[in-house]
């Protein structure tokens, strides 16, 4: 995977050994999507794990986001949290209470998230979104209203941004 993703992309962290993984690398592919490849504990059968990095004005909000997401989706829970103050590596510039790495499940699917204070040249935008297929109007309304509450905003055609600026598409199955 690494060679193909790195081709015509930008390596953000070389593929190699780090304190948290015997094999890890971070790359931005030719389309601007970043990928973290690592050898770690198997997360069930899910090979690709969406990872949200809370940066800029959202740095320090990963916990709030996980709390929101796990409260509105069924079969959801926070699986583990590692804060910078108790973590590995030399992240002395980070706020100790912020999340270095966390795992959570939404409707049975694994997600990771983290806070980071670096001045990254990217942020959440519509280029990446989560698509949620709903069974009925009640589920659609519940997810929509929960995700736009407290600072989220509606967009067009079933799109919205949650209070953290992350994009979601809420799509009733009967429309497909």
Question: Whereabouts are the PLM-identified features?
Answer:
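Vicinal oxygen chelate
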Residues: 1-24, 71-72, 85-87, 106-110, ...
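N-terminal beta-strand motif that seeds the catalytic metal site of vicinal oxygen chelate
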Residues: 10, 14, 36-91, 129-130, ...
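Short, structured interface segments
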Residues: 24-42
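A structural signal for well-ordered alpha-helical scaffolds and beta->alpha junctions
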Residues: 62-66, 97, 137-140
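Acidic pyrophosphate-coordinating catalytic loop
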Residues: 88-97, 121
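Short, structured active-site "lid" loops
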Residues: 95-108
């Amino acid at each position: 995977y690494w060679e193909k993703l790195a081709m015509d992309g930008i390596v953000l962290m070389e593929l190699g050994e780090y304190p948290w993984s015997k094999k890890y690398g971070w790359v931005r592919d030719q389309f601007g999507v970043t990928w973290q490849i690592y050898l770690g504990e198997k997360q069930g059968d899910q090979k690709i794990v969406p990872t949200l990095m809370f940066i800029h004005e959202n740095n320090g909000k990963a916990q709030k986001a996980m709390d929101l997401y796990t409260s509105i989706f069924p079969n959801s829970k926070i699986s583990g949290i590692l804060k910078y103050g108790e973590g590995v590596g030399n992240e002395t510039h980070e706020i100790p209470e912020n999340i270095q790495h966390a795992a959570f499940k939404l409707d049975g699917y694994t997600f990771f998230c983290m806070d980071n204070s670096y001045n990254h040249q990217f942020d959440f935008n519509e280029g990446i979104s989560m698509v949620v297929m709903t069974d009925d109007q009640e589920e659609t309304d519940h997810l929509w209203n929960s995700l736009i509450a407290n600072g989220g905003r509606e967009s067009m055609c079933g799109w919205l941004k949650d209070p953290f600026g992350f994009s979601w598409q809420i799509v009733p199955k009967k429309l497909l």
